Swiss-Prot record:
The keyword Iron does not apply. It comes from Pectobacterium atrosepticum (strain SCRI 1043 / ATCC BAA-672) (Erwinia carotovora subsp. atroseptica). It is an enzyme of class 1 (oxidoreductase). Belongs to the dihydroorotate dehydrogenase family. Type 2 subfamily. Pfam families: DHO_dh (PF01180). This is Dihydroorotate dehydrogenase (quinone). InterPro entries: Aldolase_TIM, DHO_dehydrogenase, Dihydroorotate_DH_1_2, Dihydroorotate_DH_2, Dihydroorotate_DH_cat, Dihydroorotate_DH_CS.
């Protein structure tokens, strides 16, 4: 109800400053009785996916709460699951500012944040405090100064630390803002990473006496051949799920608009069709062998349904949440 007024004020500010102010307020109320200020009632729409029970199929995508500082406040808004991160083994400041831009006319965002986060240990301490009743995903990545050839070591370090506290673990190999990261999506590099992750998952399952599923997050900028190869690798290594998709480098839908020339990943409405098409192609290729979490430009009930009709078992929002606020959660969960 109040979001259009709040949004108008926030959109007068630099996007990253607006984000910081919003999270400052959410941090104040998270894990306190004042969570009622953001709480909204949504119906239960149970879904089982990756062996986990979700109270509804709508989640918050990674990138909004990178350090897990506002899990309970965000959870009070009605999300069935929340994905925190991307987090790296060591804290890092990310790329130089400005690094976040609104393409308001297209309801899009361009970011080149560069995995800015306070490190995996800080995130784990926050996760330990949460009372969120939904499924918590933890999205992990590599530090910028870790050579790509040693990148898998960063993922294994993070897995070790987050495994006891995660509902599922998301492997981010598709951000366009960490040099060389997307090369891990292909060929031998992907197979090498998936084998190491699967072995680590088996080791941690024995150690902690619980199985935590692993999902891999992929880019939308994939050729048919690359998509087929990725699907084949995910199945061969018994990965539990795939998150499709991350942001795009394609700018054809925002040509001529403000900030269209900024480097970074584009999200929001301009990503909607291409991410849905990747989900559709992936679904055909996987033939039900592992579930898809659909993300990319969901800004309405119709857009969420399109992702699910294309083959997604669960969906996530991020940019749509920025542009439309908590009401979008209620609309999607109520009518999906």
């Amino acid at each position: 109800m109040f979001y259009p007024v709040i949004k108008k004020a926030l959109f007068q500010l630099d996007p990253e400053r607006a984000h910081e102010l919003t999270f400052q307020q959410l941090r104040r109320i998270t894990n306190t009785p004042f969570e009622f200020l953001v709480r909204q009632s949504v119906p239960t729409k149970p879904v089982t996916c990756m062996g986990l029970s979700f109270k509804n199929p709508l989640g918050l995508a990674a990138g909004l709460d990178k350090d897990g500082e506002c899990i309970d406040a965000l959870g009070a808004m009605g999300f069935g699951f929340i994905e925190v991160g991307t987090v790296t083994p060591r804290p890092q400041s990310g790329n130089d500012k400005p690094r976040l831009f609104r393409v308001v006319e297209a309801e899009g965002l361009i970011n080149r944040m560069g995995f800015n986060n306070k490190g995996v240990d800080y995130l784990v301490e926050n996760v330990k405090k949460t009372r969120f009743g939904g499924v918590l995903g933890i999205n992990i990545g590599k530090n910028k100064d870790t050579p790509v050839e040693q990148g898998k070591d960063d993922y294994l370090i993070c897995m070790d630390k987050v495994y006891p506290h995660a509902g599922y673990i998301a492997i981010n190999i598709s951000s366009p803002n960490t040099p060389g990261l997307r090369s891990l999506q292909y060929g031998e590099a992907l197979d090498d990473l998936l084998l190491a992750i699967k072995n680590k998952q088996t080791e941690l399952k024995e150690k902690h006496q619980k199985y935590v599923p692993v999902a891999v997050k992929i880019a939308p900028d994939l050729s048919e051949e690359e998509l087929i190869q990725i699907a084949d690798s995910l199945v061969r290594y018994n990965i539990d799920g795939v998150i499709a998709t991350n942001t795009t480098l394609d700018r054809k839908l925002i040509q001529g608009l403000n900030h269209c020339g900024q480097t970074g990943g584009l999200s929001g409405r301009p990503l909607q069709t291409s991410s849905t098409e990747i989900i559709r192609r992936l679904s055909q290729e996987l033939a039900g062998r592992l579930p898809i979490i659909g993300v990319g430009g969901i800004d309405s009930l119709v857009a969420a349904r399109e992702k699910m009709d294309a083959g997604a078992s669960l969906v996530q929002i991020y940019s749509g949440f920025i542009f439309h606020g908590p009401r979008l959660i209620k609309d999607i969960v109520t009518h999906i």
